[in-house]
Amino acid sequence: MNLPQQQPPAAAPQQPQSRRSPVSPQLQQQHQAAAAAFLQQRNSYNHHQPLLKQSPWSNHQNSGWGTASMSWGAMHGRDHRRSGNMGIPGTMNQISPLKKPFSGNVIAPPKFTRSTPSLTPKSWIEDNVFRTDNNSNTLLPLQVRSSLQLPAWGSDSLQDSWCTAAGTSRIDQDRSRMYDSLNMHSLENSLIDIMRAEHDPLKGRLSYPHPGTDNLLMLNGRSSLFPIDDSLLDDGHSDQVGVLNSPTCYSAHQNGERIERFSRKVFVGGLPPDIDEDEITASFRRFGPLVVDWPHKAESKSYFPPKGYAFLLFQEESSVQALIDACIEEDGKLYLCVSSPTIKDKPVQIRPWNLSDSDFVMDGSQPLDPRKTIFVGGVPRPLRAVELAMIMDRLYGGVCYAGIDTDPELKYPKGAGRVAFSNQQSYIAAISARFVQLQHGDIDKRVEVKPYVLDDQMCDECQGARCGGKFAPFFCANVTCLQYYCEFCWANIHSRAGREFHKPLVKEGADRPRQIHFRWN
């Protein structure tokens, strides 16, 4: 018997069906409509986590993301902006995080395009614990100078950072139980380290004067959650200690004043042999007012850099950042094309100095003792404080601080450094060696090591009683002495047998220790 077909009311909405086989076109449309409604609701709730679709770029991108996703437990739909520096393939510009060196496999967010180095993937809790806001492009990599601001425990911001891609805004208790046995122990230890770091603000902190570094999570010179392996420094991948999330990363302002990140003096190497000073100035004038200089320029009176390199002295620090943004990065180095009368578009190396590389504290719990500090002369200018600290610590151990001497005006390295030790044995071993071979990357140089001499110390023998309370002008660097002496006490002590050949070190004004007819024994 043929029954009349009942037409559904036009105004009645279709009820989504959770499980139905599309045996008819009408049911298939209902299934598609239900799926579209679910996707629309999911995207509207978690709009900053776009669904992963088939990439129109190339297949190797999908495979690259798939590998990284599987290492985190195959959680699909994760925001790729939250996975910076956590095993995602790519290359980070160690000097200018804002600059996009080359098109990589990672599709970066449109606001701050950057790539990050490939490191070992971390667990899902370690990946998300550094997420500091609900909808942010901020990447928090494994950099020492990142200005991390963790929300209070139990806050919505920290909990939202652990949400799954399905749109859960709170930690699912059932799911958290599943991860308790795997990650909660390490998370608890990490949080304890964080609280200790907050109570001990100098523990592992770099000597960086900006207030944005108040919450650095560095313990013993390393991140409490993401330990840096020494091989990263050996391979030249660690940028110490760097700077991706420092307050100056985006040319930020604090209290209405712009924060400087780089020295206004920039090294330029590999210049064409026939380029003169005016042509160098013309090549870089578009970045801002500058002066071209090179060693012994005034004495030589030459218009051509004699060794193919020069220094650019910019009037404003912002010009240096503009120059960096215009460069091309290759193998961790910056290049810019410069033309001369006979050579067109020759790539020259641009080597800026990051101010944050001038100091490195490996262990802030140890007090800095100037009598356990050495002076290192002839330090290559590309060498950073973190690299100097690692080299000395591998040789002698007990390093708690390293610094690179910079000139007060341009804040550019002067070719000398300081290293403080936590124990007398390491200090004596270093000064007894007299010379150290600094090897790091392209750097391989023999440098001189001396005790670090101060000009405000009293005589260790008479405590100023025989010299009218004046500071001691002499320091004996022989391991049998290692003391400051006034003129009277020096003559008295070193007239004894076995000490007549000791020679003093002095420090004049703001100069570094200078040797006076010194002979090591």
Curated annotation (Swiss-Prot):
<dbReference type="InterPro" id="IPR000504">
    <property type="entry name" value="RRM_dom"/>
</dbReference>
<keyword id="KW-0597">Phosphoprotein</keyword>
<dbReference type="GO" id="GO:2000766">
    <property type="term" value="P:negative regulation of cytoplasmic translation"/>
</dbReference>
<comment type="function">
    <text>May play a role in translational regulation of stored mRNAs in transcriptionally inactive haploid spermatids. Binds to poly(U) RNA oligomers. Required for cell cycle progression, specifically for the transition from metaphase to anaphase.</text>
</comment>
<dbReference type="InterPro" id="IPR034819">
    <property type="entry name" value="CPEB"/>
</dbReference>
<protein>
    <recommendedName>
        <fullName>Cytoplasmic polyadenylation element-binding protein 2</fullName>
    </recommendedName>
</protein>
<feature type="region of interest" description="Disordered">
    <location>
        <begin position="50"/>
        <end position="88"/>
    </location>
</feature>
<dbReference type="GO" id="GO:0005737">
    <property type="term" value="C:cytoplasm"/>
</dbReference>
<dbReference type="GO" id="GO:1900248">
    <property type="term" value="P:negative regulation of cytoplasmic translational elongation"/>
</dbReference>
<feature type="domain" description="RRM 1">
    <location>
        <begin position="264"/>
        <end position="355"/>
    </location>
</feature>
<dbReference type="Pfam" id="PF16366">
    <property type="entry name" value="CEBP_ZZ"/>
</dbReference>
<feature type="compositionally biased region" description="Pro residues">
    <location>
        <begin position="1"/>
        <end position="11"/>
    </location>
</feature>
<dbReference type="GO" id="GO:0005840">
    <property type="term" value="C:ribosome"/>
</dbReference>
<dbReference type="GO" id="GO:0043023">
    <property type="term" value="F:ribosomal large subunit binding"/>
</dbReference>
<keyword id="KW-0677">Repeat</keyword>
<dbReference type="GO" id="GO:0035925">
    <property type="term" value="F:mRNA 3'-UTR AU-rich region binding"/>
</dbReference>
<dbReference type="GO" id="GO:0071456">
    <property type="term" value="P:cellular response to hypoxia"/>
</dbReference>
<dbReference type="GO" id="GO:0000900">
    <property type="term" value="F:mRNA regulatory element binding translation repressor activity"/>
</dbReference>
<dbReference type="InterPro" id="IPR012677">
    <property type="entry name" value="Nucleotide-bd_a/b_plait_sf"/>
</dbReference>
<dbReference type="GO" id="GO:0005095">
    <property type="term" value="F:GTPase inhibitor activity"/>
</dbReference>
<dbReference type="GO" id="GO:0008187">
    <property type="term" value="F:poly-pyrimidine tract binding"/>
</dbReference>
<dbReference type="GO" id="GO:0098978">
    <property type="term" value="C:glutamatergic synapse"/>
</dbReference>
<keyword id="KW-0810">Translation regulation</keyword>
<feature type="domain" description="RRM 2">
    <location>
        <begin position="372"/>
        <end position="454"/>
    </location>
</feature>
<comment type="similarity">
    <text>Belongs to the RRM CPEB family.</text>
</comment>
<dbReference type="InterPro" id="IPR035979">
    <property type="entry name" value="RBD_domain_sf"/>
</dbReference>
<dbReference type="GO" id="GO:0032869">
    <property type="term" value="P:cellular response to insulin stimulus"/>
</dbReference>
<comment type="subunit">
    <text>Interacts with TENT2/GLD2.</text>
</comment>
<keyword id="KW-0963">Cytoplasm</keyword>
<dbReference type="GO" id="GO:0043022">
    <property type="term" value="F:ribosome binding"/>
</dbReference>
<dbReference type="InterPro" id="IPR038446">
    <property type="entry name" value="CEBP_ZZ_sf"/>
</dbReference>
<feature type="region of interest" description="Disordered">
    <location>
        <begin position="1"/>
        <end position="35"/>
    </location>
</feature>
<dbReference type="InterPro" id="IPR032296">
    <property type="entry name" value="CEBP_ZZ"/>
</dbReference>
<feature type="compositionally biased region" description="Polar residues">
    <location>
        <begin position="55"/>
        <end position="70"/>
    </location>
</feature>
<feature type="compositionally biased region" description="Low complexity">
    <location>
        <begin position="12"/>
        <end position="35"/>
    </location>
</feature>
<dbReference type="GO" id="GO:0005634">
    <property type="term" value="C:nucleus"/>
</dbReference>
<dbReference type="GO" id="GO:0043024">
    <property type="term" value="F:ribosomal small subunit binding"/>
</dbReference>
<dbReference type="GO" id="GO:0099547">
    <property type="term" value="P:regulation of translation at synapse, modulating synaptic transmission"/>
</dbReference>
<dbReference type="Pfam" id="PF16367">
    <property type="entry name" value="RRM_7"/>
</dbReference>
<feature type="modified residue" description="Phosphoserine">
    <location>
        <position position="21"/>
    </location>
</feature>
<keyword id="KW-0694">RNA-binding</keyword>
<dbReference type="GO" id="GO:0045900">
    <property type="term" value="P:negative regulation of translational elongation"/>
</dbReference>
